[in-house]
C-alpha cells in the first residue's frame, strides 16, 4: 500500500485524483480552531474545497469561523462519552442524533463563510443510518431559492442523500417523520 505522503506527492505532481483526510480529536477539532488552518494549507497546496463533515449539533457550533452552523435544540443525541450501548451505531464523530417526536420540528442549517476554500458547501450530502421507517423525508432549502422534498431510504448501515445539485452557499434541512432513523450530519 502507498503511504499517505506518497499519495500527497503523487497528487502534487500529477494534479489528478483526491486524498481525503479525516482528523479526529476533541473540541478544538469540533470548533475548527486549529483544523481550519491545516485544512486551508492542504487545500492551497494540493487542491480541494469545503470544510468536510459537520455533525447535526455541536457545543462549538457558535465558535466555528469556517461555517455558520445552527440547529433546532430538540434533537435527542447520544455520545460515546456518555453511552456505552447506543440505540443505533455512532457516527464517525462518536455521536448519533434522533428526531424522536414526529410532532416537533427538527432542522439543521449550514452556511459557508468567507474563508478561502470554504465559501461554498461543496456537494452537500446528508449521512444517516438504518431505520424501520419508510415515511421519513426531508425538506431541503438550498440558497433559499430552491426547495425540494427528498425521501429518506434508511436501508443500509450508512446511507447518503445528495441535498443539492449545485454547490450551495447555504442549506437548511427540515426532517419529517424521521423518528427511528439515526441522523449523523453533512
Question: What are these regions, as identified by a protein language model?
Answer:
Residues 1-24, 28-185:
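N-terminal secretory targeting modules
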